[in-house]
């Protein structure tokens, strides 16, 4: 069965630093789709974050590239299998140079956020499986 994929493309100041940051979070880099101008960060079988140098990113848009440290361009939210996994990933991000964001605890839903090296906002959320199945 076909599984649709998502490729999140983000402009970054330093591709090598982004590669290091995301590998420290436990993700892998797909060398087939990576270069000096781009890092293909494999989040899962169906989610890939493409970290593009600003020069390379500019080839795909006529719009001004947002400075994610000053404006919000998107909120990228990833699921986690447990509250502990939420904390683990965000703690790794902060240890790797990211900035901790807001924590949200609603009992059956728990999340924390971080900004990566370029200010892109990532939210990591866990939801109680019994609540999701309804």
Regions found by a protein language model. Name each.
Residues 40, 90-134:
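Vicinal oxygen chelate
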Residues 70, 74-91, 97-98:
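Mid-chain, well-packed structural core segment of small domains
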Residues 9-57:
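Core segments of cupin and vicinal oxygen chelate
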Residues 4, 37, 45-47, 72, ...:
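Residues that flank catalytic or metal-binding motifs in active/ligand-binding sites
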Residues 1-17, 73-78, 128-134:
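N-terminal beta-strand motif that seeds the catalytic metal site of vicinal oxygen chelate
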